[in-house]
Amino acid sequence: DQLLKLHAKGITFHGVIAADDSLALGALKYAREMKLRIPEDLAIIGYNNSMLVNCCDPELTSIDNKLETLCQHLITTLMGVLGGSEMPKKTVFSGELVKRGTTK
């Protein structure tokens, strides 16, 4: 709906980065309705690298936020704190762009 509203206002765009893979599927639907070629006319990137990325054609490029790694680290840190161990005050996790068919 939001992409249709932007289009109706005359706003043009060549890419969409969605906050979630399910929202990126909405961008795929928009592209089909507008007869846009993916990724030539419109590139689409989702977020979470969920199971949804393989359920569409073309398959969705997505940012993998490494949620499983984050959760494992959280449990290890929590167990360390509860056990009285000195734990790092800060840990940085980097996501990974998993390129598939919705980007060049």
What feature does the model see in each segment?
Residues 4-104:
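Flexible loop/turn connectors
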Residues 1:
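Helix-loop module immediately N-terminal to the HCX5R catalytic loop
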